[in-house]
Amino acid sequence: TGIRPQGKEIVRTWLYYTLLKSTLLMDKPGFQNVWIDGLGMDPWGRKMSKSLGNGIDADSVLECGAGGRTGAWRVKGPDKSVQLKANKIGSECFRLWKACDAQVGDDFHINPEEIESKYFGVLTKIFNIARFASQFPIPVNFNDVPSNLCAGDQWILSEFAQVLEDVEKGWREIDIFTSTRIIKNFATDVLPSHWLEMAKGRLYADDRNAAWTIHRIVKDLLTIFSPICPFFTHHLSETLYGESAVDVRNYPKSLIVNGDDAVRLRNLTGFLCDFNSETWRAKKDQGLSLNAEIEGVTIPAVLSEFATELTAMHKLI
């Protein structure tokens, strides 16, 4: 067996007994790795027990949202009972929460309201990215990299190359927390908030390079996310690409060489995100919509290679 999952409260009993028994019977350990998880706590950080009346049934959390059913839980707190409510959670959101909210060995608070508010939106954002990508032509050959990618496409592919590398390292080390956090951060921030906003105009103008870029990233993103949310990623990948993100034989490999130029582009990410945020803030301060033209904004020299895309994105005049 490759791994034995268990709670930390039975290390000196079941873990030691199992190791002793397997050694006596087979003269070798019964498993290679031990996954020692933390304990589920109530919203106030206390262990759940019948005597405290603070237990939350996991099945009721998993079923929250199924068939339109909402969830409600009365939990006894230190001072008074509180009513917790949620509308949509389900198994995929539950898995994402467990993978992303605590590192291995750490205790974790079980609060359905927080699970929904912090993680259902992550799935919604990834779903919306995939739905947005579905509007544009799917490449005939995902492995055929366009020869004249613009600076913005090269930048996001360089970012994604590092994501692929770091997530694979996490999976190999059974570091589910780190891998999931990396995917979450990329899929909810850099990709939609910055690159997609830069690329929308080109996508709507039938730019084949932009279409190749978004589909290549979405397809591989669903694959590396499938160990956490298999049903969610299977549905999206089957719908978009006619194949399951779960049914893969090899980990996705970046088609962009993760070398010096990729590092140089990634070093511009902070400047790029800061410039976008400052420009959006300037529009808000002037009472302008984000789609409105704006004067007096200068693109910094360090971002000169993105000038055409940033000018179109922010409607700079």
Predicted segments with their positions:
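A short glycine/serine-rich beta->alpha loop
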Residues: T1-E9, K80-Q83
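Active-site rim elements
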Residues: R4-G7, P112-E113, L265
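Short, conserved micro-motifs enriched in small and acidic residues
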Residues: P5-W14, W212, P227
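Short Ser/Thr-interspersed hydrophobic loop/turn segments at strand-loop and sheet-helix junctions
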Residues: Y16-L24
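Feature 926 captures the class I aminoacyl-tRNA synthetase adenylation module centered on the KMSKS loop
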Residues: L24-K80, K85-S91, E114-I317
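Structured mid-domain segments that build the active-site/substrate or prosthetic-cofactor binding neighborhood
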Residues: R95-C100
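Short, solvent-exposed helix-loop connector elements
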Residues: D106-I115
